[in-house]
């Protein structure tokens, strides 16, 4: 009975969520697009000509937002792919419906076959921005969940270390709770500038937050 009440409460909040309605109206696949939008507007992350990698991209709302931003910043004299000034590569183990001008690679980005496909698209270029809305399946057991969250952040940090430009940036989703301070310390070890971000589009009840790291301390 309690579970049913929880599901009904979540459904009510979801249906009446202004960001859900806005996403439906503006064609985004998920309300998460507005989290990236708010952070981008604050920190000026996405700019014309960039190479952007979206980790754990499905269903694709972050890639959609990045694509729309690079389309708006298109220059007439720019060398571009399709309708954008820049390159967006979306990676996920899950399938994802195509997005115009976005390269999608399905698979585990730790595997050689996926990395080979990534390198083919990069064609020798380094990455300007890595964005990750990845989240593990949470069990409700604090210690276990903290380890899973830290592991996902570690994967993004390792990917960024291997592919970012020295002045590049990494934005990852995280959660306040046990282990959060350790994740922040790892960011500070890897990046010169580290800042937490809690966009208004994140639900008030959620412990979800984001960590932004800029400028690698030890470029590869």
Curated annotation (Swiss-Prot):
S-adenosyl-L-methionine binds at residues 60, 62, 92, 108, 133. It catalyses: uridine(2552) in 23S rRNA + S-adenosyl-L-methionine = 2'-O-methyluridine(2552) in 23S rRNA + S-adenosyl-L-homocysteine + H(+). The keyword Secreted does not apply. Keywords: Cytoplasm, Methyltransferase, rRNA processing, S-adenosyl-L-methionine, Transferase. Its main location: cytoplasm. One of its GO terms (cellular component) is cytoplasm. One of its GO terms (molecular function) is rRNA (uridine-2'-O-)-methyltransferase activity. InterPro entries: RNA_methyltr_RlmE (IPR050082), RNA_MeTrfase_FtsJ_dom (IPR002877), rRNA-MeTfrase_E (IPR015507), SAM-dependent_MTases_sf (IPR029063). Pfam families: FtsJ (PF01728). The active site is at residue 173. It is found in: Cytoplasm. It comes from the Bacteria. Its EC number is 2.1.1.166. Specifically methylates the uridine in position 2552 of 23S rRNA at the 2'-O position of the ribose in the fully assembled 50S ribosomal subunit. Belongs to the class I-like SAM-binding methyltransferase superfamily. RNA methyltransferase RlmE family. This is Ribosomal RNA large subunit methyltransferase E. It comes from Burkholderia thailandensis (strain ATCC 700388 / DSM 13276 / CCUG 48851 / CIP 106301 / E264).
């Amino acid at each position: 009975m309690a579970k049913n009440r929880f599901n009904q409460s979540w459904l009510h909040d979801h249906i009446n969520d202004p960001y859900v309605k806005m996403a439906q109206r503006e064609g985004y696949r998920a309300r998460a697009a507005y989290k990236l939008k708010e952070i981008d507007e604050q920190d000026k992350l996405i700019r014309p000509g960039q190479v952007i990698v979206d980790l754990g991209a499905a269903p694709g709302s972050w890639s959609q937002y990045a694509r729309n931003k690079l389309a708006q910043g298109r220059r007439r004299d720019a060398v571009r792919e399709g309708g954008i000034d820049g390159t967006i590569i979306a990676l996920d183990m899950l399938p994802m419906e195509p997005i115009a001008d976005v390269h999608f690679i399905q698979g585990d980005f730790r595997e050689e076959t996926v990395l080979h496909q990534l390198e083919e698209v990069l064609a020798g270029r380094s990455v300007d921005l890595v964005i990750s809305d990845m989240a593990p399946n949470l069990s409700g057991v604090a210690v276990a969940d903290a380890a899973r969250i830290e592991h996902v952040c570690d994967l993004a940090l390792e990917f960024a270390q291997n592919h970012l430009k020295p002045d590049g940036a990494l934005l990852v989703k995280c959660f306040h709770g046990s282990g959060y301070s350790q994740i922040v310390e790892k960011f500070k070890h890897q990046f010169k500038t580290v800042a937490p971000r809690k966009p208004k589009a994140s639900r008030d009840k959620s412990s979800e937050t984001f960590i932004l790291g800029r400028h690698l301390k030890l470029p590869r």
